[in-house]
Swiss-Prot record:
Its EC number is 4.3.3.6. Pathway: Cofactor biosynthesis; pyridoxal 5'-phosphate biosynthesis. The active site is at K81. HAMAP family: PdxS (MF_01824). One of its GO terms (biological process) is pyridoxal phosphate biosynthetic process. Keywords: Lyase, Pyridoxal phosphate, Schiff base. It comes from Anoxybacillus flavithermus (strain DSM 21510 / WK1). This is Pyridoxal 5'-phosphate synthase subunit PdxS. Gene3D superfamilies: Aldolase class I. Belongs to the PdxS/SNZ family. The lineage of its organism: Bacteria, Bacillati, Bacillota, Bacilli, Bacillales. InterPro entries: Aldolase_TIM (IPR013785), PdxS/SNZ (IPR001852), PdxS/SNZ_N (IPR033755), RibuloseP-bd_barrel (IPR011060). NCBIfam families: PRK04180.1, pyridoxal 5'-phosphate synthase lyase subunit PdxS. CDD domains: pdxS. Catalyzes the formation of pyridoxal 5'-phosphate from ribose 5-phosphate (RBP), glyceraldehyde 3-phosphate (G3P) and ammonia. The ammonia is provided by the PdxT subunit. Can also use ribulose 5-phosphate and dihydroxyacetone phosphate as substrates, resulting from enzyme-catalyzed isomerization of RBP and G3P, respectively.
Amino acid sequence: MAVTGTERVKRGMAEMQKGGVIMDVVNAEQAKIAEAAGAVAVMALERVPADIRAAGGVARMADPTVIEEVMKAVSIPVMAKARIGHYVEARVLEALGVDYIDESEVLTPADEEFHIDKRQFTVPFVCGCRDLGEAARRIAEGASMLRTKGEPGTGNIVEAVRHMRKVNAQVRKVVSMSEDELMTEAKNLGAPFEVLLEIKRLGRLPVVNFAAGGVATPADAALMMHLGADGVFVGSGIFKSENPEKYARAIVEATTHYEDYELIAHLSKGLGGAMKGIDISSLLPEQRMQERGW
């Protein structure tokens, strides 16, 4: 029998969300909308990434009251974010009973050198990555699910596309290498050799990799599935749109039926305005959340 909190169990829990949509919510009402639309999980926050970006300052773990309200409102899994390197925030979230913890670059990092040792927790962790080096380091630390970093709160899919393509291209390269070449590749990527060896033997990443950071429309979600995403996170794209209920349902349907272009065309009709987007080139270096983490 598998033991609660083992790597196998935690990875299996994340695998159960495959093919689905995970939505950011800030209260019980939004959580109910997400669940009714078919979300496989919700991410409980005080503010969606677009509002965190607009407010500036230091972004921290959400008030536990908000998280508990969301947990009571829905029957689907509830995730919550901890700051990069903030071990105590993660322990608090675990004590609250959340189903997953996202060690997230959307929040202001608490440690500029170390990420959380996720192997010490029974709850599974989600982490962002831009390339295979970051992905492998997070897996070695105990991450059970990955997601592209994209550029959160922008409604601009370009960075999520870049990150998904890069990770997948690097995975293909590793799979094609002989085992004696992997040590040099591990050095080049700053990645643990054992993780690359596992990727080579499996022919893929050992954990699921979702798309996140800039998904704003049904077509965006379908695009990321075409590029090899195992599922989709939608942060600001739902509740910053003109019609959250319609957008939520449409994005869930487009994620499931991402190869049915007639359906996606139908889903895209009459939705109202998508969230206002931001051109990535207009962001200052310190405004680029994807740069957080190492």
